[in-house]
């Protein structure tokens, strides 16, 4: 799949995940927050908890599923990016935090199975 098609599929998966989370009552703080250490796909608020959401999309699981792609190295990058986010967005620094993963396999929005893993890993 060409890079632009993969990027489009990734954007669609993020939009699908965002809509799902908003229907669950979460509120968007930031989307695609970039820093020198990486990117945070979605930063949401669930009650009083700041939730850093990694959205992983795989069209099929031939090379490993979406969930398995959030390995230890990726987790460490997300934790570092979240720390930098909280240093800059000081209003949220005193809130409890958690790391969730949204794993989507198939075509986003076309009855693709969405797996929401709350507290997928610890910092």
From Swiss-Prot:
One of its GO terms (molecular function) is nucleic acid binding. SUPFAM superfamilies: Restriction endonuclease-like. Gene3D superfamilies: 3.40.1350.10. Pfam families: UPF0102. Coiled coil: none annotated. PANTHER family: UPF0102 PROTEIN YRAN. Belongs to the UPF0102 family. This is UPF0102 protein PSPPH_4120. It comes from Pseudomonas savastanoi pv. phaseolicola (strain 1448A / Race 6).
């Amino acid at each position: 799949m060409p890079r632009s098609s993969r990027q489009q599929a990734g954007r669609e998966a993020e939009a699908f995940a965002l809509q799902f989370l908003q229907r669950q009552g979460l509120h968007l703080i930031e989307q695609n927050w970039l820093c020198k250490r990486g990117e945070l796909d979605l930063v949401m608020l669930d009650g009083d908890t700041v939730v850093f959401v990694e959205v992983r999309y795989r069209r099929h699981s031939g090379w490993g599923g979406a969930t398995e792609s959030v390995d230890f190295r990726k987790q460490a990058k997300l934790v570092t990016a979240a720390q930098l986010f909280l240093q800059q967005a000081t209003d949220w620094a005193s809130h409890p935090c958690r790391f969730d993963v949204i794993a989507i396999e198939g075509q986003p929005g076309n009855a693709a199975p969405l797996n929401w893993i709350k507290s997928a890993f610890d910092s």
